[in-house]
């Protein structure tokens, strides 16, 4: 499959057309961003680590019966995916309080959330990815009711699969975001799953092993990503 013209350049990935209208190539770059793209740095090995991490997770989800856009890994930093008509909302599942939830509600970081919470955010960096709900999503034509129900159902299924996977590596999956799109009238998981889009803590020490290390200038960002990968069985070589 040959990479053709650039279709879209995001904060950390570039999307390319292919000769097949149903397929795209994602290139994972070393770019790392925070503050809705206002802070961007290059971190060596990040593109390779995230591509391999994502391929591993997507295969685990597919094995559990969750349809994703992942087709196959093409190289160290490229992957072939289905072309989805993306729904412009992020689905956020939280098992423990962290990040914006702590700031909004004055919760203690690490407070257990039982059952896990589920939130929707409109994907727009200029607006700061504001929280929205199903009613707004339907009224503005982003998705219909059946699609939103399916997205919520799949988000909780992903959580069940991945909390068990991370727990086996003595890790806590604190929270994560997912993006979905439509492929031939089906809701399909898109984008990526990597430490860029979730929070992962060491179970014993609560050490942060995700993108918060970059956001909070804690250092050793990629080393933390690689540690998580090693502990859940991601092949990095």
Curated annotation (Swiss-Prot):
Pathway: Purine metabolism; IMP biosynthesis via de novo pathway; 5-amino-1-(5-phospho-D-ribosyl)imidazole-4-carboxamide from 5-amino-1-(5-phospho-D-ribosyl)imidazole-4-carboxylate: step 1/2
Keyword Iron among UniProt keywords: no
Reaction catalyzed: 5-amino-1-(5-phospho-D-ribosyl)imidazole-4-carboxylate + L-aspartate + ATP = (2S)-2-[5-amino-1-(5-phospho-beta-D-ribosyl)imidazole-4-carboxamido]succinate + ADP + phosphate + 2 H(+)
Gene3D superfamilies tied to this protein: ATP-grasp fold, B domain (3.30.470.20), Phosphorylase Kinase, domain 1 (3.30.200.20)
KW Transferase (keyword) present: no
GO BP annotations, alphabetical order: 'de novo' IMP biosynthetic process; cobalamin biosynthetic process
Annotated GO CC locations: cytosol
Enzyme Commission number(s) of this protein: 6.3.2.6
Record SUPFAM superfamilies: SAICAR synthase-like
Enzyme class: ligase
UniProtKB keywords: ATP-binding, Ligase, Nucleotide-binding, Purine biosynthesis
Listed Pfam families: SAICAR_synt (PF01259)
Family the UniProt entry places it in: Belongs to the SAICAR synthetase family.
HAMAP family listed in its UniProt record: SAICAR_synth
NCBIfam families (alphabetical): purC (TIGR00081)
Record-given protein name: Phosphoribosylaminoimidazole-succinocarboxamide synthase
Organism annotation: Psychrobacter cryohalolentis (strain ATCC BAA-1226 / DSM 17306 / VKM B-2378 / K5)
Lineage start: Bacteria, Pseudomonadati, Pseudomonadota, Gammaproteobacteria, Moraxellales
């Amino acid at each position: 499959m040959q990479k053709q013209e650039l279709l879209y350049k995001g904060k950390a990935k570039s999307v390319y057309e292919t000769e097949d209208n149903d397929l795209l190539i994602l290139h994972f770059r070393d770019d790392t961003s925070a503050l809705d793209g206002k802070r961007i740095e290059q971190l060596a090995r990040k593109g390779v680590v995230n591509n391999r991490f994502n391929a591993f997770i997507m295969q685990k989800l597919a094995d559990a019966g969750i349809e994703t856009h992942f087709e196959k890994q093409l190289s160290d930093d490229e992957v072939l995916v289905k072309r989805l008509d993306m729904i412009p909302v992020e689905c956020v599942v939280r098992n423990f309080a962290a990040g914006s939830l702590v700031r909004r509600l004055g919760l203690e970081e690490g407070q257990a959330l039982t059952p896990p919470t589920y939130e929707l955010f409109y994907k727009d960096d200029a607006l700061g990815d504001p929280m929205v709900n199903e009613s707004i999503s339907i009224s503005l034509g982003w998705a219909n009711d059946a699609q939103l129900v399916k997205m919520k159902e799949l988000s909780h299924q992903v959580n069940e699969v991945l909390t068990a996977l991370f727990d086996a590596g003595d890790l806590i999956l604190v929270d994560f975001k997912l993006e979905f799109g439509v492929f031939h009238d089906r809701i399909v998981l898109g984008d990526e799953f990597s430490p860029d889009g979730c929070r992962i803590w060491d179970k014993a020490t609560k050490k942060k092993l995700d993108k918060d290390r970059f956001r909070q200038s804690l250092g050793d960002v990629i080393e933390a990503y690689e540690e998580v990968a090693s502990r859940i069985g991601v092949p990095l070589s």
